[in-house]
Amino acid sequence: CGNNCQLTVNTFSDGGRLISGNRCERPITGKKDDGRWNLYEYKRQLILGYKPGENKRGRIGLPLCLNFWELYPFWHTFFTKLGFQVVHSPMSSRKLYLEGQGSIPSDTACFPAKLAHGHIEFLAKLGVDAIFYPCMTYNIDEGLGQNHYNCPVVAYYPEVLAGNCDCLKNTKFIYDYVGIHRPHDFTKKMTAVMEREFGPIPHGEIKAAVEAAYGEYERHMKQIREKGAEIMAAARKEGRRIIVLAGRPYHVDPEVNHGIDTLITQFGAAVITEDSVSQLADPFKTTVLNQWTYHARLYAAAKYCCSQPDMDLVQLVSFGCGVDAITTDETREILREGGKLYTQLKIDEITNLGAVRIRLRSLFAALEEQEET
């Protein structure tokens, strides 16, 4: 949790402590989330578990923001296989946000996008040989929707960073348009990009790195689905309620979600993600054009929830997200038709979780009342 709430701790002569002024229950013994019931924490540890590798051809910096929360295993594997040392920016924090705040051109962007400026500032100061952050119109096609676009902010925010971050004047910033949804074309594109930026690299090496990257991405997503299934099975064995905390890959970032995942586990529920169950839903038709990869997962997860009596969905919405004006209505309708309650939590840079706690208490109280009747 990145909130860093101010606490008053009175320590007595017998070793006892009285904690006051706190806005959450994390300091209280027995309330801390150990990660056992939290798929968000598992996803964070997966990303942080990748090692930089050897520096044979240079150091590449990857910003841990937006779609890199999902694609980091892909790009890390690609570059390390080619002999690059891969370093990433740290998990977001208030300090990191403030460091990049001066280059944010518009206050209308969502908070996760604003955080990207701080990540770029960090990598530029780190002195890497290049920062790699490609523009990506498409995502990998998971077969859940009519198309597989990234939202405009995720797809093209590197253009905004290139035009506004002064720190990039002295740092190589690679933000070419690439498409991982077409492996053959992707290999050709990356061969050209790597030759332009780092000199000739044998095509065979590029091809092997691409194959390894796709394999690692599949392994990463499989790990998430398997861990989700493990948490669900354990929760059902103990009679815990299961909450699908649905959002985007970058909502795993503690500075973005403000510890809401941990807060839900403190209510005694297990927390899983939309991408851990989206493949389990039977095909169905939405009333809106289903063309965004992340949103297609959201709809599929909501549909799957409707078939599971012990599972409910809470949607995280970043303030300023234009596409969520559509997804919230569609998700609400899917859950309503399935007889489920819809809970939306709108989040931005404000860290006070008082209102969120009230919403969640109301949700769990309503669910208990439903069970009793």
Where are these regions (language model features)?
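An N-terminal assembly and electron-transfer interface module characteristic of large anaerobic redox
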Residues: 1-373
